[in-house]
Amino acid sequence: MAVITDALCPFCGCMCDDLMIVTEGNRIIEAKHACKLGAAKIMGHHRIKEPMMRPDKNSNFKEVSYDEAIEAAAQILVKSKRPLLYGWASALCEVHKKGILLAEELGAIIDNTASVCHGPSTLAVHEKGLPTSTLGQIKNRADVVVFWGCNPAQAHPRHMGRYSVFAKGFFSDKGRKMRKIIVVDVRKTDTANVADEYVQVEQGADYMVISALRAILAGQAAVVPDQVGGVTKEQLVKLADTLKTAKFGAIFFGMGLTQSKGRYKNIDNAISLTTELNSFTKFVIMPMRGHYNVTGFGQVCTWETGFATAVDFARGAPYYNPGETASNDVLYRKEVDAAMIIAGDAAAHFPANSVRHLAAIPLVQIDPYWNPTTEIADVVIPTAICGVEVEGTAYRMDGVSLRYRKMIEPTHPTDIEVLERLIERVKEIRGD
Amino acid sequence: MTLKVNLITGRTINQGANLENKTSPDYLEATAYCELNSNDIEKLDKSGNNVKVRTNYGEVTVKLKENNGNPDGIAFIPMGPWANAVVDHDTKGCGMPGFKGIQAELEGTSDKILLMKELIARYK
């Protein structure tokens, strides 16, 4: 039996770094300190054992060798005039680097799961910048914390304990007792149940509510109607007062803003609110990133291509325009004629109309697990699990990079090995 | 009778814990349901334990659950293939489909809930 201390969790953007992993032989038998989400991932589920292929999408899969599967995948991608390489969030930065090389070689579109998560937040940051901090600063200093359109009690279960609500730090030694917690949401979530104040917004009215708060902060409360987006003026005035009298405030936001009416403009407005709060006190804002390394893809893609995601190499140079080049844009328009889905599950998390097109085109899947994407794939290549069986770098939701160690030895080739062989074969077929 | 609601989709802890276990009954249990508050449930006809969700983008049958954290007229389905059968594909020019704020019609039904494989097979 061996124990790995201070192990990193490869599930959500919190990247908790205090796990204790107990192994026996090449098997993990316990993941101490992990939440339900982290433990479920680390303890594992049924894996795809061997690569698989089928002659058409309604036939049964037949197990094949890695050589055969990589050859078939390379042929699909090379024959494609407009390939899409999507996923990446459950993989380490070293995998992203290889993926971008493959996209460049193919003239493909490369996009990650931020497309259906915090992609709009990136667009807002282009417009307004991001007054933010590390999670450590929030843990040590924040006395007012706002969760807007996010539900960490269910989606980031240890966030409140480690960083934002209950955590005790240098200037926050009383933890929960010294913090005012505000939840703004359209329904009363488990997170709202631990808040000091719950602000219930009408679905899709976040932009108006943020604008009303900005007006009140600017001394223009007189122009604010008695009720805005389902929230009374009285509650808004009280909320604005709580925010501006904080010693150090933090706003965390989630899909409630990025996926509701207004999309990136909601974030744009929330960033402006944060900036304006800095006229009164110190205030920061941070997206609650979902997959543990979805932030890492944005980092790698930005330093390699100049853009965070939805990058189109068809012109020979990186081109980026979400709304035109993001996965769901090109799928719904039936623009792409082949796809490779890796470390993400498009068929589970894309709208039906996008999945219909994925089901109609040649599809390669690289993933440890059988999921809805497998159901519509032509070639399936199982790989080792990043962060559990593969070491490497990932970026936490606050942009801090941390290094994952192996917990156990892999039983499958890594994504990096598969991508390297794929790139090599693509180059050979194209005669490069 | 048919109940008109505003549908939102999103994460839950059980959906997340089964993210890499999507062929299992646990994943179906964690994602193939629709939550309404008790007022709204009262308004639905009771022709079964399930609910048929119909939008401009599709139709899906899921289990009906009560959650009084939802205000009147708000329905919630955990993110996943069942929710995505009825969400809006339009990315409004920024790459993000409409996963929240979809006008939907609900009715009670005794129709069965499709398994993940059966649901995805509809797209082939």
Residue ranges and their predicted role:
Chain A
Residues 1-220, 255, 335, 422-432:
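N-terminal export/assembly segments and adjacent metallocofactor-ligating motifs
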Residues 62-77, 231-242, 323-330:
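A short, well-structured juxtamembrane/interface segment
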Residues 83, 145-146, 181, 198-200, ...:
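Short, well-ordered beta-strand core segments
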Residues 97-99, 158-160, 194-195, 264-265, ...:
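Short amphipathic alpha-helical segments
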Residues 208-209, 220-320:
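Active-site phosphate/pyrophosphate-binding segments
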